[in-house]
Each structure stands twice: as structure tokens, then as C-alpha cells.
């Protein structure tokens, strides 16, 4: 029998207070078992059902667990131990799912990283996390990830192994596909029982998520088996996931949203099927929806707009199986939201979440005005919300303010980041999200901007998202982003970047007219409009205001 002692909490982990943890346990939110155990138990209920589709690969639950458990014991054979950090930088592929589950079964901590990361980002994550292993493709989109991983590993003494998926695995790398070969039936049963016995406890850290911040390198968020299992299960319940669910994973699996919101892991916990797409392009996604009879997916607003436009141009694809489309990561304009149901034939669900915990969803039975105009409400009855003014006083219903939260799946601090914790968390455990929201009488949140997303024009503080909200009311404007244009007289003037529908033309005067008709203060009117084919995004998929400010700054110099 191979049993391991409980893995020590990473040195930088901030636990919930004992009395709070006891309350969440008594409420039934925290079950005291590992996420890997929950996934294994779900798989045993439907062993022959197909659970994972990736191109020609069609994997049953029994095969998935035979591969994940096989990978777990082989990783252990490499010297990877519980609480070791494993950076997973893979594109959307079946190996991403298997190696994540292997880590969860072993007790190692996966850290999902985007394939777009290069030396600066990847080395930053590896160094901060003190990672033991890197998991990468050999080459992806003509970039040699294997070479980069070894370059990073050579500079970070904690990294002992580079695991590589692909056909060109170097002798000094570990062949990931060989590592993920399935155990035979007898061996699978023996290893499964062994891993069940040595599974991490619920209060132990399950994974480190990367924060979605746009300043500097992402921070690390330590999520426990208790809190993460509860969040995923509760989200799956709100979304109505079950054995008939067929989830299309079209967003990069380097993000948390398509994995845990409820996403891939929520689908597997519910006994459903995950279909992996390597591209969000409508041609590829619609073909998979039609072939696999997809019932649910999660996307970002930019993808929604591409899909709607494609649907207008080519209405032939059979999307009749699609029941639910989650949209999150950035604000979905109501004008776009209203088109989803009529054009794509499915229910829209707005999503507002963060790596730090809080997850808000509109509900399947919400009226259309709630779904179109709000970003939903927290999924747990024990999620706590405060909306406050700059002095920390609670504002009234409908008034904008800064969002603070705490709850059974919102950790009490970042991993090993005391200075960030001092800024982002109050002494009594409230997380300062940095979001500006309004709370409706029925408890839904409307995200109106970011606390730092303000333009200072001659001392007047202008919320950029307010300007953007007016801009997208102009016919032909698909996306808008307002930033401050440096100005020697006023400090900043308002510069508006827009993305237009094909064949349309929009002038600055068109936006100003909409704002003037709404009797908006004159100091909020944009003074420059720039059309782009697309808005730049951060590695976490959010609109990159820093890049736009830099572009605006260069323009002010010419």
C-alpha cells in the first residue's frame, strides 16, 4: 500500500479562519474530499459513456481515469510529489484534461498557463510558483514551446522535468503521451484504490490559478479542493448540467472560465461529454456543434459577435441542439445580447467571475431584461457582497460603487504575495475586486467599470465604460474602448477606439450626438475617435487598456 502524508500547505497560502471554515463545512459546501476523488467517483457511475472528444479521439470515462491515474503514478515515479507545482502550458487538447486530472489525483498543483506566454510571462510564473515541472507542446502555431520550456527550466533550479506533447520530443524531455498511456483494467483498479487512499484532504490546495489583472505579471490564487469542488458543482447545478450535457470547450483551456465555470470539470463531474475545439472560428465551432450535438458552450463577447455575423451570412448550420451559451470575461453590450436567442436559438447566460473566486451567473429562468442588462448574481447563498463608496460606506441599491466580496470559494489572499494582499484584502477577509458595479433590487450585479479605469480630464473623473456604453449605441459600432489621451492642458482628453461592422463608417460626431441626446455632461464627450480592426487583448483575454493608452500616448506626440 502506498499512502502519503497530507501535503503541507504552500508557504504562501492564506487559509480561511477556523470558525469560517467550520461554518462552510456545516452548511455542506465543503465536503472534505479532493476534487480528484469527486471526478473519479463521477467517472465510476458511467464508465462506458463517452466523456472526451478531441478530433478523432473519443474517450470513455473508464479510459480517461485509466490515463489520468496512469499519468499520476508515472509523474510520481519522476519525483513529482503532492504540493509540487506543475505549469500546464498546452493548447486545447485531450492531454490538457488528462494531465490536469492526473495532478489532482496525485495532489500536485496544476497551474494553467496560456500558450501565448513567452519567456517573460512563463519564467515569471515558474519562478513565483517555484514550479517542479513544465508541460508544453513541442511546437504550436510555429513556435517552439519545447525549446522555451528548457530555457526557462535551466534558469529555475526547482524545475526538474519538461513534459512534452507531440511527435518531436527531445531526449531530455519526458514524452507526455507515453506518460498518459492508459493502465490495463487490473492495474487501473489497483492504482485507483491506491490514489483514493492517498488523496489530498479537502482543505489542502488543489491548484494555483493565475489572476486576470492587467498590471505586470499575473498573481497566483491558491484554490483548495473544498472551495473549488463546491464552486464547480454549484455552477453546474445552476447551469442545469447533467449526463445529457455536451459541452464545447472553445475558449483556451489556459483560462479558468472554460474549465471551472462550470466548464470542462463541471461537465465531467455531471457525467456529461466534453468536446474540444482548437479554434473559436465559427466554421470550426459550428461544425462541431452540428456533429456532436453540443448543448452548451462558453465564449467571450468578441466570439459572440463573430458567430452572429457568420450566422447572418451562412444560416445553414444546424445548431438545434445548443441550449446554453455562457458569455463572460468582458462586458456584453445589451444590443448584442438581444441577438443571441433569435439568431443562435439558445439561452444566453451572462457570467461575471474571477480567478480570486466570486462567480455570478444569470439564471436559466431569469427574464430577458435581467439576462440582457445584468451580469447575474452570486451562485452561493453564502457569497457575501458589499458595494461601497471611496470611503468604504455601503451605497444604496442602484448606485455605483466598488465591489467587495468574501465567501466559501473566495480565498483570503494571494499565494505568497503579502504586499498584494495588503492592497487587495481587508483584515476581515473582504476581497477588493477592483470592479465598479451597481446592485439591482433583486440582487443582480451590473458591472459598470474598473476602479482604475478612470479618465482624469481637468480634474473630472470619467468612467471609461460609461463612454463605451454610449459608443456601442451607434449603428455599426461592435466594440468600444475609451482611454485617456495625454494632454498638457487638461491632463487627459478622451480617446475612443472602436471596432466597426463590415461596410460601416462612424464619425466622432455620431458618438457625441448620442451622448448629447442623453444629456450627458459635456466633459464626458470623447475628443478623438480611432477605428481598429480589433481591440488588443491581454494574455488573459481582457481588453488591453494599457496597450491602448500607449497607442494614444504615441498619437499625442505626433
Curated annotation (Swiss-Prot):
Keywords of this protein's UniProt record, alphabetized? Antibiotic biosynthesis, ATP-binding, Ligase, Nucleotide-binding
Record EC number: 6.2.1.43
Q: Which residues form a coiled coil?
A: none
Which one of the record's GO molecular function terms can you name?
acid-thiol ligase activity
Query: Which GO biological-process labels does this protein carry?
Result: antibiotic biosynthetic process; fatty acid metabolic process
Q: What broad class of enzyme is this?
A: ligase
- Can you name this protein? 2-hydroxy-7-methoxy-5-methyl-1-naphthoate--CoA ligase
Please name the gene that encodes this protein. ncsB2
Amino acid at each position: 500500500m502506498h499512502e502519503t502524508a497530507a501535503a503541507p500547505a504552500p508557504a504562501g497560502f492564506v487559509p480561511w479562519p477556523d470558525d469560517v471554515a467550520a461554518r462552510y463545512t456545516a452548511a455542506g459546501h465543503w465536503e472534505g474530499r479532493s476534487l480528484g476523488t469527486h471526478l473519479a467517483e463521477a467517472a465510476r457511475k458511467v464508465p462506458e459513456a463517452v466523456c472526451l472528444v478531441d478530433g478523432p479521439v473519443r474517450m470513455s470515462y473508464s479510459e480517461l481515469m485509466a490515463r489520468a491515474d496512469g499519468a499520476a503514478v508515472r509523474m510520481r515515479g519522476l519525483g513529482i510529489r503532492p504540493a509540487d507545482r506543475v505549469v500546464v502550458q498546452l493548447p486545447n487538447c485531450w492531454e490538457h484534461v488528462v494531465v490536469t486530472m492526473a495532478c489532482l489525483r496525485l495532489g500536485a498543483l496544476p497551474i494553467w498557463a496560456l500558450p501565448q506566454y513567452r519567456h517573460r510571462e512563463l519564467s515569471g510564473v515558474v519562478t513565483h510558483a517555484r514550479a517542479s515541472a513544465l508541460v508544453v507542446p513541442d511546437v504550436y502555431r510555429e513556435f517552439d514551446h519545447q525549446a522555451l520550456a528548457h530555457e526557462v527550466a535551466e534558469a529555475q533550479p526547482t524545475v526538474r522535468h519538461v513534459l512534452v506533447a507531440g511527435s518531436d520530443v527531445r531526449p531530455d524531455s519526458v514524452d507526455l503521451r507515453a506518460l498518459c498511456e492508459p493502465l490495463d483494467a487490473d492495474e487501473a483498479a489497483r492504482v485507483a484504490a491506491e490514489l483514493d487512499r492517498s488523496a489530498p484532504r479537502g482543505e489542502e490546495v488543489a491548484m494555483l490559478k493565475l489572476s486576470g489583472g492587467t498590471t505586470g505579471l499575473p498573481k497566483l490564487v491558491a484554490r483548495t479542493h473544498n472551495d473549488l469542488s463546491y464552486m464547480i458543482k454549484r455552477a453546474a447545478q445552476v447551469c442545469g448540467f447533467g449526463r445529457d450535457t455536451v459541452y464545447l470547450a472553445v475558449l483556451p483551456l489556459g483560462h479558468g472560465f472554460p474549465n471551472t465555470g462550470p466548464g470542462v470539470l463541471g461537465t465531467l463531474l455531471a457525467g456529461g461529454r466534453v468536446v474540444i475545439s482548437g479554434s473559436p472560428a465559427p466554421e470550426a465551432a459550428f461544425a462541431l456543434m452540428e456533429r456532436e450535438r453540443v448543448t452548451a458552450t462558453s465564449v467571450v463577447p468578441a466570439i459572440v459577435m463573430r458567430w452572429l455575423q457568420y450566422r447572418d451570412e451562412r444560416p445553414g448550420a444546424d445548431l438545434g441542439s445548443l441550449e446554453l451559451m455562457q458569455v463572460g470575461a468582458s462586458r456584453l453590450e445589451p444590443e448584442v445580447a438581444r441577438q443571441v436567442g433569435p439568431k443562435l436559438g439558445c439561452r444566453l447566460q451572462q457570467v461575471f467571475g474571477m480567478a480570486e473566486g466570486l462567480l455570478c451567473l444569470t439564471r436559466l429562468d431569469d427574464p430577458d431584461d435581467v439576462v440582457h442588462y445584468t451580469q447575474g448574481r452570486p451562485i452561493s447563498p453564502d457569497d457575501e457582497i458589499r458595494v461601497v463608496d471611496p470611503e468604504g460606506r455601503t451605497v444604496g441599491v442602484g448606485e455605483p460603487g466598488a465591489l467587495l466580496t468574501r465567501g466559501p470559494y473566495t480565498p483570503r489572499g494571494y499565494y505568497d504575495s503579502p504586499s498584494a494582499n495588503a492592497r487587495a484584502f481587508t483584515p476581515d477577509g473582504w476581497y477588493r475586486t477592483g470592479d465598479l458595479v451597481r446592485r439591482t433590487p433583486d440582487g443582480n450585479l451590473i458591472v459598470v467599470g474598473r476602479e482604475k479605469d478612470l479618465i482624469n480630464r481637468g480634474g473630472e473623473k470619467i468612467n471609461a465604460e460609461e463612454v463605451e456604453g454610449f459608443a456601442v449605441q451607434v449603428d455599426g459600432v461592435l466594440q468600444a474602448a475609451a482611454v485617456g489621451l495625454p494632454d498638457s492642458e487638461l491632463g487627459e482628453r478622451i480617446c475612443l477606439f472602436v471596432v466597426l461592422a463590415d461596410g460601416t463608417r462612424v464619425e466622432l460626431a455620431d458618438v457625441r450626438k448620442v451622448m448629447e441626446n442623453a444629456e450627458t455632461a459635456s466633459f464626458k464627450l470623447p475628443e478623438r475617435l480611432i477605428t481598429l480592426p480589433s481591440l488588443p487583448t491581454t494574455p488573459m483575454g481582457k481588453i488591453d487598456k494599457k496597450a491602448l493608452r500607449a497607442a494614444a500616448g504615441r498619437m499625442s506626440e505626433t
